[in-house]
Amino acid sequence: MYKDLEGKVVVITGSSTGLGKSMAIRFATEKAKVVVNYRSKEDEANSVLEEIKKVGGEAIAVKGDVTVESDVINLVQSAIKEFGKLDVMINNAGLENPVSSHEMSLSDWNKVIDTNLTGAFLGSREAIKYFVENDIKGTVINMSSVHEKIPWPLFVHYAASKGGMKLMTETLALEYAPKGIRVNNIGPGAINTPINAEKFADPEQRADVESMIPMGYIGEPEEIAAVAAWLASSEASYVTGITLFADGGMTQYPSFQAGRG
C-alpha cells in the first residue's frame, strides 16, 4: 500500500475490462478516487464500479472513445468536475488484430494507430495541460508493450504504435521534467486478460508462449496493476521517461538461456 495515493484522482482509459479493470480496483484499494472509462459496454463499467464499492472505493464511469478528441477532453474534465482535480492519467486503452502487412488496409492501420498511439497522446496532452495550468506535479502512465522492443509479424500496426509510444513518452518526460511532471510507460508481456483467453486456453499455444518467458509463467493483470500503483506513488518520485517491462523476462532474449546462441 502507498499512503500517498489516498485521495489522489486517477483516470484510466479502457478500464471496464482487462488490465484497466485491475488497475481501477488496485487504485481503489489504495483509497484513490477512480474514473473508469469505457467505449461502449456500460454494463462492464458498472460491474467495475460495483467491485470498487466492495473494497470501499469511490469511482465514476465516463463513456468515451479515445480516438475522439472531444471525448478525451470530456473524460479529463469529468474527473475534475466530479473530484475537483486530476493527479494521475493512465492511458491504457488499446487494441490489436493480426493482419499480414502486405494485405493490411489503411483502415486496419489507422484504427490501431489512432487508438493505441493517438489516443495516448490525447490523454497525455489533456492531463499535462491541466498539470501545467494548475502547477501540479502530476503523473502520466502509458500502457506500452514488450512490442515496443520486440518485432511482431502480422502486427506491424501494433508494434509501430508501441514503438511510437516509447519515444512519445520519453519526449514528454524530457519536456515536462522541469515542472515535476513524470511520464512513464509500462511494458507488459503475456498477461491473462480476456483478449488472450481463447489463445491461452489452448494447451499447445499456452506452452508455446510460456517457452518465451524465462520466468516460465503467464502474468496476471494484478501484477501489472501493482507496477502502475508504484509508478504513480511517491516511491517512484525520481523515475521518469522509462518503460518498466513487466514481462517475466520476455524482453531478455530467452532463446539465449542456458548458453544457447
From Swiss-Prot:
- State the InterPro entries in the record: NAD(P)-bd_dom_sf, Sc_DH/Rdtase_CS, SDR_fam
MF (Gene Ontology): glucose 1-dehydrogenase (NAD+) activity; glucose 1-dehydrogenase (NADP+) activity
What's the Enzyme Commission number for this chain?
1.1.1.47
Q: Where does substrate bind?
A: S145
- Give the record's GO biological process terms: sporulation resulting in formation of a cellular spore
User: Which Gene3D superfamilies does the record match to this protein?
Assistant: NAD(P)-binding Rossmann-like Domain (3.40.50.720)
Q: Residues of the signal sequence? A: none
Q: What class of enzyme is it?
A: oxidoreductase
* Any Pfam family: adh_short_C2
The answer to keyword Oxidoreductase applying to this record is yes
What are the UniProt keywords, alphabetically?
NADP, Oxidoreductase, Sporulation
**NCBIfam families membership:** PRK07231.1 (NF005559), PRK08936.1 (NF006493)
On assembly, the entry states:
Homotetramer.
Q: Which family does it belong to?
A: Belongs to the short-chain dehydrogenases/reductases (SDR) family.
Q: What is this protein called?
A: Glucose 1-dehydrogenase
